[in-house]
Amino acid sequence: MSELLSFALFLASVLIYAWKAGRNTWWFAATLTVLGLFVVLNITLFASDYFTGDGINDAVLYTLTNSLTGAGVSKYILPGIGIVLGLTAVFGALGWILRRRRHHPHHFGYSLLALLLALGSVDASPAFRQITELVKSQSRDGDPDFAAYYKEPSKTIPDPKLNLVYIYGESLERTYFDNEAFPDLTPELGALKNEGLDFSHTQQLPGTDYTIAGMVASQCGIPLFAPFEGNASASVSSFFPQNICLGDILKNSGYQNYFVQGANLRFAGKDVFLKSHGFDHLYGSEELKSVVADPHYRNDWGFYDDTVLDEAWKKFEELSRSGQRFSLFTLTVDTHHPDGFISRTCNRKKYDFDGKPNQSFSAVSCSQENIAAFINKIKASPWFKDTVIVVSSDHLAMNNTAWKYLNKQDRNNLFFVIRGDKPQQETLAVKRNTMDNGATVLDILGGDNYLGLGRSSLSGQSMSEIFLNIKEKTLAWKPDIIRLWKFPKEMKEFTIDQQKNMIAFSGSHFRLPLLLRVSDKRVEPLPESEYSAPLRFQLADFAPRDNFVWVDRCYKMAQLWAPELALSTDWCVSQGQLGGQQIVQHVDKTTWQGKTAFKDTVIDMARYKGNVDTLKIVDNDIRYKADSFIFNVAGAPEEVKQFSGISRPESWGRWSNAQLGDEVKIEYKHPLPKKFDLVITAKAYGNNASRPIPVRVGNEEQTLVLGNEVTTTTLHFDNPTDADTLVIVPPEPVSTNEGNILGHSPRKLGIGMVEIKVVEREG
């Protein structure tokens, strides 16, 4: 209803101003600004909804602000371009419509009415309401009744007798199991669900609506609210360090806790969370690649579900035979938005909906088949009688190709339990939420029936039952939950450990590299990883007077304040203000001590603008002083005009990438020497090894042969035509996820370049 009211007010404002208000520059600017705000808010809502499926929520702040790189960003380029073009067109059209009767005399009453209607349209819009609620949740002091509802359970389970298998199905919400809405979509896993305790009304709350948040909620009984934004949890050394979570209780009770997934464990800090709370045995894409039968059988996120669940079954067999008490958690990935992936062993590879194939539904049908096969193996084993199997979604599906059909249904998360010791078949329609999952499992295992804000759905009363406004209540508790991190509020001295690549201050530890915004009563960490924006781009968003401490590789800050370190890959520390003074210090000891030194200086806006502009230079446009092309730092020597076909810098150098160009092309600003030696330090990937690799300068071509290890080769060139471009053509680029960014399409690697140097020959 509010959407219709908001749009009606917007339309009325446009029509009244366009036809009645007349000419007045101030009223035109004010009305256009407010109407433009309405458009921006609604486009923001649309864009956020595209990513999250739930509008502007905490997942937008946590996952999208600084982490599109790890979200399969290529899938969203076209929608992003469409939004920008649409916004430009709408603003242009608005301005044209409002000025249609600009030659008519100004009418104060109609101008005021149009402006008030425009303000009303903004106030009534769902986007404004959602943003207002988010802002309030960031600034509240908390709710006095939090302590009454947050309960810490006993740290142990007396006399535990059951092993636990807990399966997180990526985005595998219960809605998919509605056979009337989606016939024969989930027959195998749906049949198993109907054999156990099926909790049919598991609500999704703020702070539980993306993978790591769903894991925290289900194991600790609290939403994931943190004193920082972005994927900073990937950078911290501990995760809710004061809280008692399910993994802690299991470990204290004699369980060995295992976690197996196909993606990289570092994504969003899952490794940090699990290690902080009782899990000593973690297996992700890096750990599995030396174990699985086919390490090259991967999707954009990691290993396919059939591979992961096969490894989980092997681990279940091994642990069961050992006789030790254990928990085995696993997380699937094939149903990840926006399209999902199909394991090659599935019988169900295709699902049609509305008369055409649907990739997301197909991925769901395939993944549930794999999960069901895993469960059936456990059920058929002699160890099932000592096992509790839990299947849950980590969160509701985000905007995938099935999302519009899901939204027509009553959506709930999946949570069901199959007990080997005590078969129970029942559908429980009690109102509950993800935070109740851990408490319910704890209750079944013989522990307490509460965990944080979670309550057992078998013997307790969920917060979703107690509070009709549970979403608003959860946001009201946000400051109380943030305080559970015990996060430092000041930074005066710090220590950098080069062996561990860590920085420590005020009792907290963070992985490097790291950017920190430091104010009087708050220290905000902003990390960099494969899944977040580069720190220099994050620093470019700082205000002129914001105090910062930036710890990174020296070459990344050298172009601004330390050109002598332009080729150094050592650690450096920069601190200051973008509009004031900055210092750069080289970290020259294994354990390096530093102090913050922020001076209250006069802000120079010209200096600020220059710093911001330099920080925003993209990697390929950076230039440094050197007599050779060094590939393990960003940019190129000053003599290079442009280059293509080359991937991002890595610690050793860069790969050629045929996804970016079939050949490596380096164009220099001036013609290459008439006679020169080309000294190439490089290696080959896969089948490119031991094969002739053409290297061309103008009309002359030489042959380069490389192995799988780095070697240096010198080629002799004559350049009578004054050519200015060097071309290297890898013979057989290989499509691979080796060293790839999680969630990105495979690269096509040919040769790995460490250094290329042009040496002029006399004569």
Swiss-Prot record:
Topologically, how does it sit relative to the membrane? Multi-pass membrane protein
What is catalysed by this protein?
a phosphatidylglycerol + a membrane-derived-oligosaccharide D-glucose = a 1,2-diacyl-sn-glycerol + a membrane-derived-oligosaccharide 6-(glycerophospho)-D-glucose
The keyword Glycosyltransferase appears for this protein: no
Q: Where is this chain primarily localised?
A: membrane
**Which SUPFAM superfamilies does its entry note?**
Alkaline phosphatase-like (SSF53649)
Q: What is its EC number?
A: 2.7.8.20
GO molecular function (one):
phosphatidylglycerol-membrane-oligosaccharide glycerophosphotransferase activity
**HAMAP family named among the record's database cross-references:** MdoB_OpgB
Name of the protein in question:
Phosphoglycerol transferase I
> Source taxonomy lineage?
Bacteria, Pseudomonadati, Pseudomonadota, Gammaproteobacteria, Enterobacterales
